[in-house]
């Protein structure tokens, strides 16, 4: 299946999709439905909240994640759970050919990266075996319904010797940072 093409800004400055394929999403599990609904809701404010929560350091961390792949320019990269496209943009700026995929149509609509986009569950990808040289994933591992199935799919779409780099949060150990983390991840 051909990925959705980001056809540039549409109404309201959001990307328009051309040649959009039918959804390749499997039947919803309860967690999948909750995760999709949450990200559809927060998509317009996601980048702002991320910048505030990380004091802007998330951009540096995303660049470091792409650099950790250690792949030459021109490599085909899959941005799994691409969201608004920060990792996709970081990879494209380093000369990679990027495709983004996300479960949330709202996040894809807010995606500002000018790369092909596909709405897909990470555990059921529509790409050929060995289609990518590298795969990046940012802040998403905890949201996958079946992490083992997702990692198996990642391995399937990576070429032999392909590389995966994931950016994820960890609980801080010091005072106010720990309190903020607990409030955000356990109450919000």
Where are these regions (language model features)?
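A short acidic, Gly/Pro-enriched loop at the edge of an enzyme's catalytic core
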Residues: 123-134
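Conserved alpha-helix/loop element of class I SAM-dependent methyltransferases that forms part
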Residues: 45, 54-73
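Hydrophobic beta-strand segment of the Class I
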Residues: 46, 135-136
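Short glycine-dipeptide loop
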Residues: 73, 158-163
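Class I SAM-dependent methyltransferase SAM/SAH-binding core
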Residues: 76-125
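Conserved class I S-adenosyl-L-methionine
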Residues: 163-187
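A short glycine-rich, Lys/Arg-flanked "PGG" loop and its adjoining helix->strand segment in the class I
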Residues: 148-160
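N-terminal, positively charged/glycine-rich alpha-helical extensions of SAM-dependent methyltransferases
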Residues: 2-45
């Amino acid at each position: 299946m051909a990925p959705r093409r980001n056809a540039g800004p549409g109404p309201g400055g959001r990307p328009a999709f051309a040649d959009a394929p039918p959804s390749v999403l499997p039947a919803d599990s309860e967690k999948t439905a909750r995760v999709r609904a949450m990200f559809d809701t927060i998509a317009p404010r996601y980048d702002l909240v991320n910048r505030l929560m990380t004091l802007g350091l998330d951009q540096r961390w995303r660049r470091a994640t792409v650099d950790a792949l250690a792949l030459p320019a021109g490599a085909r990269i899959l941005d799994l759970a691409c969201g608004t496209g920060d990792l996709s943009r970081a990879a494209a700026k380093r000369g990679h050919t990027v495709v983004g995929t996300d479960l949330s149509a709202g996040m894809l609509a807010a995606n500002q990266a000018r790369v092909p986009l596909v709405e897909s569950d990470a555990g059921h990808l529509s790409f050929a075996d060995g289609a990518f040289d590298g795969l990046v994933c940012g802040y998403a591992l905890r949201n996958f319904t079946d992490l083992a199935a997702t990692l198996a799919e990642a391995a399937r779409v990576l070429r032999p010797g392909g590389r995966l780099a994931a950016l994820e949060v960890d609980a801080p150990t010091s005072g106010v940072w720990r309190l903020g983390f607990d409030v955000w991840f356990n109450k919000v």
